[in-house]
Amino acid sequence: MSDLSVFSRMAQSTGSRSVRLQVLSQMHQDMEQYVPKRAGFLRSQSFVNDTGVHYTAKYARAVLRLCKWPPGTNYSTPGTAADGI
């Protein structure tokens, strides 16, 4: 999980929780192009709250957090693979 302490300090300094949510929402939008898309389930099953960006699809943890692909799967997004696929 990423360190969001910088956003906590920023939100505290402005006295506004909305700053944190705005930054997290922008992060969510910016990251979407790098989220694997076969049928769009991982991208569509995500949300932002004041604790971070969350992906709820069953394979999200294996794909995004552990950087391991479940056996027999091939998730890819054009332009995100090392070989430029």
Curated annotation (Swiss-Prot):
Protein name as it appears in the record: Uncharacterized protein ORF6
